[in-house]
Amino acid sequence: MVSKMIIENFEALKSWLSKTLEPICDADPSALAKYVLALVKKDKSEKELKALCIDQLDVFLQKETQIFVEKLFDAVNTKSYLPPPEQPSSGSLKVDFLQHQEKDIKKEELTKEEEREKKFSRRLNHSPPQSSSRYRDNRSRDERKKDDRSRKRDYDRNPPRRDSYRDRYNRRRGRSRSYSRSRSRSWSKERLRDRDRDRSRTRSRSRTRSRERDLVKPKYDLDRTDPLENNYTPVSSVSNISSGHYPVPTLSSTITVIAPTHHGNNTTESWSEFHEDQVDHNSYVRPPMPKKRCRDYDEKGFCMRGDMCPFDHGSDPVVVEDVNLPGMLPFPAQPPVVEGPPPPGLPPPPPILTPPPVNLRPPVPPPGPLPPSLPPVTGPPPPLPPLQPSGMDAPPNSATSSVPTVVTTGIHHQPPPAPPSLFTAVFVLPDTYDTDGYNPEAPSITNTSRPMYRHRVHAQRPNLIGLTSGDMDLPPREKPPNKSSMRIVVDSESRKRTIGSGEPGVSTKKTWFDKPNFNRTNSPGFQKKVQFGNENTKLELRKVPPELNNISKLNEHFSRFGTLVNLQVAYNGDPEGALIQFATYEEAKKAISSTEAVLNNRFIKVYWHREGTTQQLQTTSPKVIQPLVQQPILPVVKQSVKERLGPVPSATTEPAEAQSATSELPQNVTKLSVKDRLGFVSKPSVSATEKVLSTSTGLTKTVYNPAALKAAQKTLSVSTPAVDNNEAQKKKQEALKLQQDVRKRKQEILEKHIETQKMLISKLEKNKTMKSEDKAEIMKTLEILTKNITKLKDEVKSTSPGRCLPKSIKTKTQMQKELLDTELDLYKKMQAGEEVTELRRKYTELQLEAAKRGILSSGRGRGIHTRGRGTAHGRGRGRGRGRGVPGHAVVDHRPRALEISAFTESDREDLLPHFAQYGEIEDCQIDDASLHAIITFKTRAEAEAAAIHGARFKGQDLKLAWNKPIANMSAVDTEEAEPDEEEFQEESLVDDSLLQDDDEEEEDNESRSWRR
């Protein structure tokens, strides 16, 4: 049988534990006492309980654990924790003990009352308009409460009971019934003790205590000076409003006081008794230790520590949302107004009787007679405390405070207005505020129409915004308020701000849209999204390293996406900027959406070019705006073209400026296009840019002017065809130059290969005693060189200008006319039975030339079927012919010539037009004897399209095969001669002969547009 610890009085042991633990423990003694009591209650032997307590309490007490546990068990065994049994009964003991304690406290309060009056005699000058004795009594009583808070050890034996949360909940529910509580913190100690005694006794004892409670001076009694006098009679016109209808919560009420203080000298409030169901008959009679109220929260209306604060904020704390507190504007407050009592139907707001800060100045009194208790104010009125946007009055901050207060204390203020649907407040900036008293010049903007009182509704608590940091102790204002004072309307929900024009010299904080970093041009994340249409072909590059910002590097990268029309490096004076213009929008879009890093540098940024960017940069440049400083600053939209373009270039410019204006030098890279640098300068009258010279700086600025471009297009619409021809001619010449460069490079590579081949052959001939391994390696190298030399020769031959330039003299119309005439003559002679051999050869040559130039249409000939394929271009394996890239840029070493057989003599004339519909034909050789033809297409993709779709001709199948120029590779499988179209398609795509070429060289030279 395990002997259990016997504890006679748990509450007494808990008090003993609290007192014993306080000096040796950092934790809350009352909470730790509960924990120790729970450990001792366990159903174990004394030895086990000792071990358990030592183990569990070592974390809290450490070195003192062993001593405390021994002392605890000694106290339990000897019952020394029980109070000495002097009283005959426990009930009379408790009553006498509490009455004795109450008398001692009253005596202390009476002796200290005079000290309180002396201590705060300075602050009585700032008291609200009320009776001096009442104010002194309330102030001293409040100070006594604060002072008594510090005596924590006196009440450590009275920790909060377990049902404190339930009591608080009951008190909160009691709000809606007939229980009244005070919102203020001015309860005296005797009232707190009376309340707890009410809970522990019967209703008759509660009534006795309520009569004792009536000895305390009521809250709003302004006629008596003796706080213990009990002849209180209400004098207010609203005194008949019972507290049962309008309850005022107690200290621990769920409504937290952030509203303004009381109003009117005759506002009264009665105290009611506790309801019977509020009395806890089973509770212990000692007064519980209430959780300390947060001083910052009660004085300011908020606490910066929030949930981390160890003090009580009440059951309904104000939550300050995540607002940028230091960045808001400082807002002055509305002036106080001393008017009548609150309207009937609303409870009088309770006072907050905490002492004001030392540096608090009284507000400006309104017009009218001052209360007799307030001394007259002389001199200029001091500035008003700042008003929070939620409509609550706040005192000015001290110099050391970082956050303004929300609720003023001890000062008679005007109550806030009734909250509208959107909590708005009208306020003025510092030094330009209006007193909002009666203004004879503008009586319509007085403050008399605003409601004087509002009932605090939990659902309509406004957010606390507009809290700002800084020193708000403003100097007194010497001048009367001006009509043009700046006024701001703040919507606390949408938080929009509109700022009007104020007096000159009033310095205010810069708002978010006035800051210099707002809406910068180079910050793409904050700009308004612009929907670019299909007409934009310009790309803008930023952060290009100077060593990479040159024409050759940029052209090498961006020419893969399409035809470059314009390229400017160091664009707009930025050494790390560039401007790229493509021929079409699709090419520009393909370039900007490419996942590949520009020039292998991931820091280079590519943006769509905005046409207004250059103009915006120039208008915001200080050099260009310099002549306009003396003029009134207008929005950019209202400026004229001359103002946007800057000063007009004068006739007498400096030599350096004249040189830069008249001659397009190569070093002026930022302003010249590719055509200008190559020597093809267009007419200056149709230029979309204009040179603007600033004689003060000696710099040239290129400004894009869309209006000038439109005007030039209207006035010079007659000369646009000639301009288009010039542009086309320039493009052709540029393409020709690039083609010549490519051909020159190929020629150099070919010569090197030939030299290497000769050297290897001579080495083989001279060295007869060479090892077989070395000889085999040299032979292998020679074979590869021979293949490459043959390919290069074919490519150089195909790109030779002599083959196409003499024939390009004829125009398209002339070529079509000559082809039709020859075809007609051939038809007539064949009908007449004459010799047509020479005429047929001429007709074939014309067909070949027309096919090369793309003139030969797919619909010509005698009933040629298009087979539903539509256009002649774009077929194949999806490779296409590029997007404006010249044909010389595509280097494909696979065979492009088709060997065609199995056609009749009558089909010979229509054979070339049949295959011309699949692509551009470079060469055509037809053997009349064997009826064998070799047709060479310009690209491999076109040849593949012709091989796949052109095998069917006039209802019969042609035999198609790739024509291979190298003899040892010319062996054709017998399967290739099969007429089946699907079989030929499979062979043409999978055959090893298509994969025999050098893949690396193909990747280096081929256009990569198909990879996008």
Curated annotation (Swiss-Prot):
Residues 537-611, 896-965 form the RRM domain. The modification Phosphoserine is found at S127, S501, S523, S621. GO terms for molecular function: RNA binding; zinc ion binding. Residues 394-404 have a biased composition (Low complexity). It holds the Pfam family PWI. Residues 973-1005 have a biased composition (Acidic residues). Residues 169-186, 862-882 have a biased composition (Basic residues). Residues 98-127, 724-800, 828-852 form a coiled coil. InterPro entries: Nucleotide-bd_a/b_plait_sf, PWI_dom, RBD_domain_sf, RBM26-like_RRM2, RBM26/27, RBM26_RRM1, RRM_dom, Znf_CCCH. Keywords: Acetylation, Coiled coil, Isopeptide bond, Metal-binding, Phosphoprotein, Repeat, RNA-binding, Ubl conjugation, Zinc, Zinc-finger. CDD domains: RRM1_RBM26, RRM2_RBM26_like. Disulfide bonds: none annotated. SUPFAM superfamilies: RNA-binding domain, RBD (SSF54928). The gene is Rbm26. Signal peptide: none annotated. Residues 106-236, 334-404, 465-520, 647-667, 858-889, 970-1012 are annotated as: Disordered. There is a cross-link at K106 (Glycyl lysine isopeptide (Lys-Gly) (interchain with G-Cter in SUMO1)). A zinc finger (C3H1-type) spans 288-316. This is RNA-binding protein 26. It comes from the Eukaryota. Residues 334-388 have a biased composition (Pro residues). There is a cross-link at K94, K106 (Glycyl lysine isopeptide (Lys-Gly) (interchain with G-Cter in SUMO2)). Residues 106-118, 134-168, 187-201, 209-227 have a biased composition (Basic and acidic residues). May be involved in the turnover of nuclear polyadenylated (pA+) RNA.
